Amino acid sequence: MNVLLPTQASFFSSPHRNPIHTPVSPHTNHRMVGRKRKADDDGLDDNMSISPTNSPSLATRQIPRPSKKVRANEISGRPLSLPRLLETLDAQSLRSVLQTICERHPEIGSEIVTSAPRPSVASTLGVLSKYQNELQGAFPYGGSPGSDYAYDRVKQQLTNLIDALVDFTPHYLPPNEQQTAISLSFLDSATKIVHDLPNWDSQSHRHHKDNAYDEISRAWALVISEASKRGGGFQLHSGGWDQTLARHNEQSGGKMQMAVNALGSNLGWMGGNSGVGSGDPDSIRNQLLSGRYGTNQSVPVGAPW
């Protein structure tokens, strides 16, 4: 008698069979699930350990890169800043720069003129003295100092001195300068500079000094006239300026007679019968008032007219 026994699945069945119908032990399934979770946890840890590049925490915790230290040690050439550059310029260089800027921008020149302090008599005389020294230093050694050769050697320095004198003088005249004492103080020193100008042998070279006397004489006359209008005639006499001007005229050979005449007329307008030497008819002051000063000077025999 044939009996059919039910077929049971073997645990050693071929792997090629359908795995879905392969029974799995509950313990084995638990171990696999635990292993899977562990693997997933490891991946999760890896993902958490890597911050995204756009994370805000990354930007705030960035460590300075070594390249910055290298950049700090780099050096390259660059121009000086303005304050340091000005420290290196001497007075002549600074004047040259300012003059160039003012020529390009006239409004800056006007601002400098109005903002700069007024030059004092001492500072101006210092500039003129520099030109005088340059003139004296340009004369050749030996020979006649009034010769044509000497004139050719110092002509430029002579012109520089006279031009400076002509430019500075109007600054100390009214109405630009209202204080008579300052005007007279400058004119006194400026006249001494004119006295010291070279005396040339050639008549054609003497116009430099003659013109300088004419200019300075006109300046004296203007200051005297304006001072008398403001009641400054007393200052002219009490300060001894009448005698100072008389000596200047005598040293110039009468080439400042215009200033002397202006002083005489203005002191006469004030009616100055008081003062030192007023009782002496031959005093310089009385000669100025009467217009006789210089008229009774004798001319030496053989002297040129």
From Swiss-Prot:
Lineage at the top is: Eukaryota, Fungi, Dikarya, Ascomycota, Pezizomycotina
Enumerate the subcellular locations listed in this protein's record, separating them with semicolons.
Answer: Cytoplasm; Nucleus
Biased composition, Basic residues: where in the chain? 28-37
Keyword annotations of the record: Cytoplasm, Nucleus, Protein transport, Transport
Provide the function of this protein. Involved in ubiquitin-mediated protein degradation. Regulatory factor in the ubiquitin/proteasome pathway that controls the turnover of proteasome substrates. Targets proteasomes to the nucleus and facilitates the degradation of nuclear proteins.
Subunit and partners: Binds the proteasome.
Molecular function terms, GO-annotated: proteasome binding
Q: Where is this region: Disordered?
A: 1-75
Species whose genome carries this gene:
Sclerotinia sclerotiorum (strain ATCC 18683 / 1980 / Ss-1)
- What is the protein's name according to its record? Tethering factor for nuclear proteasome sts1
- Any Pfam family: Cut8
Gene Ontology biological process terms, A to Z: nuclear protein quality control by the ubiquitin-proteasome system; proteasome localization; protein transport
**Family, similarity comment:** Belongs to the cut8/STS1 family.
User: Locations of Polar residues compositional bias?
Assistant: 1-16, 48-60
Task: Note whether Lyase occurs among the keywords.
Answer: no
Q: What is its main location?
A: cytoplasm
GO annotations of cellular component type: cytoplasm; nucleus
- Entry's PANTHER family? FI02826P
Gene3D superfamilies with a match to the protein in the record: Tethering factor for nuclear proteasome Cut8/Sts1
